[in-house]
Swiss-Prot record:
Region named Involved in encapsidation: 56-61
Subcellular location: Virion
Region of interest: S domain, virion shell: 103-263
Annotated Pfam families: Coat_P, Viral_coat
Region (R domain, interaction with RNA): 1-102
InterPro entries reported for this sequence: Capsid_prot_S-dom_vir (IPR000937), Coat_P (IPR055068), Viral_coat (IPR029053)
Name by which UniProt lists this protein: Capsid protein
Native source species: Artichoke mottled crinkle virus
Function, in words: Capsid protein self-assembles to form an icosahedral capsid with a T=3 symmetry, about 32-35 nm in diameter, and consisting of 180 capsid proteins.
GO molecular function: RNA binding; structural molecule activity
Length: 388
């Protein structure tokens, strides 16, 4: 049955539920306005009184003597180890811009290397010899940029960022440090005392990511064509990654480098092929192209020590007297290989391999080793060197 009300003529007029609720709300609002108008001062006083009581209660709870939850303290910048931490990585699209004829600005991010923890103090995976000199043609620092920079004479870095991204658990112990040295020919720091004296330095626990901004001056310098005797004249400086205090040598993170560099004055393409030669006495006589590999030998062992990570094709030959035995050390994995032994005279080889971290070494063991020649270049696994 519909709800009704009477009018002045005592007639019945139907009223819906919605209309009745609207009438009730209007009446309630009118009554509330009247109450507030007549008792406004009392209401305000009550609100203020309640607010003061709440403030005193909160202040009392925050007192040092009654604080129930305490955290391990630290100086400014300290962080607490979470249960888990990760970083989601996305691809980087290189950007090319140019405002001046004969120049181009390249902005990109590249993968540098995997970081393995160490118990003692170690820099750049234990590889010495100014590994990460800041020059666009340095193939040990950049894997993508040299193919472009090899077509230009000069460069100027606009910005450089070194970024450590962890991949280990938060229970991992040790430290990871990144530094910048303005002199690209300074020796690597020998211990933590020397490391701490760098003005551009960033350290972190292996489970926490960290970034190092490198100061740039936008001065035009020459790209490295491997014929410069004093590298500090052509390099912006050098980078380094140090580890220490770990419980083992497991992988703890990755290093990425982001940069913006302007290349000037196009030139004929410079070589991207690394060539290293030893004479009959084992003395280096040729070193051209990127420094992917350090070549040394004894009368019984030919050693190729990698100075960069990635996939490479290595070809070479060396004088020896007997058949050779291949040896692999560190993070190097052979994808394909061909070895030809000319017993009594020499041996030659072709190797396609992937290097994930440093130090990584390939050796050939035999007898009567004298001179040697090797060539190395970046490649893919599809560059199969197996003899069919």
């Amino acid at each position: 049955m519909a709800m009704v009300k009477r009018n002045n003529n005592t007639g019945l007029i139907p009223v819906s539920t919605k209309q009745l609720m609207a009438l009730g709300a209007a009446a309630g609002a009118s009554a509330l306005q009247g109450f507030v108008r007549n008792n406004g001062a009392a209401i305000v006083g009550k609100v203020v009184d309640v607010g003061q009581k709440v403030y005193k209660a909160v202040k009392k709870r925050g007192g040092k003597k009654q604080q129930q939850i305490k955290h391990v303290g630290g100086t400014g910048g300290a962080i607490m180890a979470p249960v888990a931490v990760t970083r989601q990585l996305t691809g980087s699209k290189p950007k090319f811009t140019g405002k001046t004829s004969g120049s181009v600005t390249v902005t990109h991010r590249e993968y540098l290397s995997q970081v393995n923890m160490s118990t003692g103090f170690q820099v750049n995976g234990g590889i010495v010899g100014n590994l990460l000199q800041l020059n666009p043609l340095n193939g040990t620092l950049f894997s993508w940029l040299p193919a472009i920079a090899s077509n230009f004479d000069q460069y100027s870095f606009n910005s450089v960022l070194l970024h450590y991204v962890p991949l280990c658990a938060t229970t991992e112990v040790g430290r990871v440090a990144m530094y910048f040295d303005k002199d690209s020919e300074d020796p690597e720091p020998a211990d933590r005392v020397e490391l701490a004296n760098y003005s551009v330095l960033a350290e972190t626990a292996p489970w926490a990511e960290r970034a190092l901004w490198v100061p740039t001056d936008r001065i035009k310098r020459f790209c490295d064509d491997s014929s410069t005797l004093d590298h500090k004249l052509i390099d912006l400086g050098q980078l380094g990654v140090a580890t220490y205090g770990g419980a083992g040598t497991n992988a703890v993170g990755d290093i990425f480098i982001s940069y913006s560099v302007t290349l000037y004055f196009p030139q004929p393409t410079n070589t991207l092929l690394s060539t290293r030669r030893l004479d009959l006495a084992g003395t280096p006589v040729t070193a051209s192209g990127p420094g992917y590999i350090l070549l040394t030998r004894t009368p019984t062992v030919l050693t190729m020590t990698f100075r960069a990570t990635g996939t490479f094709v290595i070809s070479g030959a060396y004088r020896c007297l007997t058949s050779t035995v291949l040896g692999l050390t560190g993070g190097v994995n052979v994808n394909s290989i061909t070895v030809v032994d000319n017993v009594g005279t020499s041996s030659s080889f072709f190797i396609n391999c992937t290097v994930s971290n440093l130090p990584s070494v390939i050796t050939f063991t035999t007898t009567g080793i004298t001179s040697a020649t090797i060539q190395c270049n970046r490649a893919t696994r599809q560059n199969d060197v197996s003899l069919i």
